[in-house]
A protein has these predicted regions:
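Short, solvent-exposed amphipathic alpha-helical segments in soluble enzyme
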Residues: 10-12
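Extended, alpha-helix-rich binding/interface surfaces that flank or overlap catalytic cores
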Residues: 16-21, 28-190
Length: 190
């Protein structure tokens, strides 16, 4: 699991990971402001809520486990929630990096244009078999899977419109990449 790889990286570099709900992203640097929120809520024996952290950080990394997850976030049912998170970041001055882990040799948004979504092949095979009167017990998804070209165009639009930045890496490099994007050691990363 990719979160296991990240956690191993953090542990091997003596980084403590505190679990808390965040309004934007999955990872932030625990600044003095963040620590103050945690301390005050703990002193009052209150549960931390996402919005408690608004105004306490200005860089966040949201991680995606693969290309399918980001395709669903941008071009699928999860789009409204993902878009709202991007707008929330923009409205609160938070630089949001979306780190997409993948083994598809995608290293930039430009690479996404030529990314081949394996779900397209399955969709096309089922559609073809249906024309032959076969596999009729296998239903065809209502919408065709997202192509790399459509996904890349949507990413570029979101970058321009909301200031979100899409970054790519292999799963085994994700831990180091998260720290790099958060600002590394000069921001308390290492």
């Amino acid at each position: 699991c990719s979160s296991d790889l990240k956690n191993r990286y953090f542990k091997s570099h003596d980084m403590e990971v505190l679990r808390a709900p965040l309004p934007v992203g999955d990872y932030i640097i625990a600044t003095d402001k963040v620590a103050d929120v945690i301390r005050r809520k703990s002193d009052r024996k209150m549960e931390l809520k996402k919005m408690d952290f608004l105004g306490t950080y200005d860089v966040s990394v949201d991680t995606k486990k693969d290309m399918q997850e980001i395709a669903g976030n941008i071009c699928g049912r999860a789009h409204p929630r993902f878009r709202d998170e991007c707008i929330l970041a923009q409205n609160n001055g938070i630089k949001l990096y979306v780190l997409i882990e993948n083994t598809d040799k995608v290293y930039s948004v430009n690479d996404v244009f030529t990314w081949h979504n394996p779900r397209v092949d399955r969709y096309n095979n089922i559609a073809y078999m249906h024309t032959l009167g076969k596999l009729l017990n296998v239903s065809l998804p209502k919408t065709k899977p997202t192509s790399g070209k459509v996904l890349a165009k949507a990413m570029l639009t979101m970058q321009l419109k909301y200031g979100v930045e899409f970054v790519f890496c292999r799963p085994e490099d994700a831990g180091a990449k998260v720290i790099e994007l958060l600002g590394g050691s000069e921001n308390g990363g290492e």
